[in-house]
Amino acid sequence: MTGAEMIVQVIADEQVGVIFGYSGGAILPTYDAVFRFNQQNRDERDKGKLPLVVPANEQGAGFMAAGYSRATGKVGTVMVTSGPGATNMVTPVRDCAADSVPLVVICGQVPRAAIGTDAFQEAPISAVMGSVAKHVFLVTDPERLEATIRTAFEIARTGRPGPVVVDVPKDVQNWKGTFHGGTRLPIPGYRRRLQRVTERALPESDCQSFLQFLSQAERPLIYAGGGVVNANASDSVRKFADRFGIPVTTTLMGIGAVDTTESLSLHMLGMHGM
């Protein structure tokens, strides 16, 4: 299996549903692998199982993937070429980082031997995206390609969701190796942090104390953010507010968490709020 085919197989395993992107020379092997995958894997309507949506440019692909992620809860997936194709993704990547939208961007890159030589359509995407993405990978060891792509999806969707960029040189895409299935990179520090957050969940005794403090509050207020929407907890927040008669206001990303026509709704706070 080629590196490009491994990328596509991992994307299929992650059940993202749709790929958004705009082709170019440095990502062509992976686009060809998508077409081959769809020829070999048809759904009940005889359509490929990994539809490819091609917009007018890469930035459009990024925002379409972000919208798709918000609407479906799946990780938005984008494939773009090197240089200008990858730099066109900066704005949607930064937008997803700010709004906690899970996104995986697969960028083509010039062959490893040409990196740093100002080759045609080369750009230092790891450096460019490092300040705007949740995490960036540059795949220099093809043996770690499969694990890197799978780990990118893990990082994108866990903890605070966000965009992960994977820069894949063209020769790594053309490399041939063995697909193992299920492999991930050893990122113990990241996984330990997630575990610590999970372990800090309020115990039952503290929940009872919270409810006692709430009953004594003179002017309680619920300030709901985007995490309520991401966690599909909107219904729980509404029931909680109704039960205790607590007004609810939201952040910009929390819009939709509560019905703004209800008497307990205070709409959105902030620069653009009420």
Predicted regions span which residues?
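N-terminal alpha/beta PP-like core and its mobile active-site loop of ThDP/TPP-dependent enzymes
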Residues: 1-274
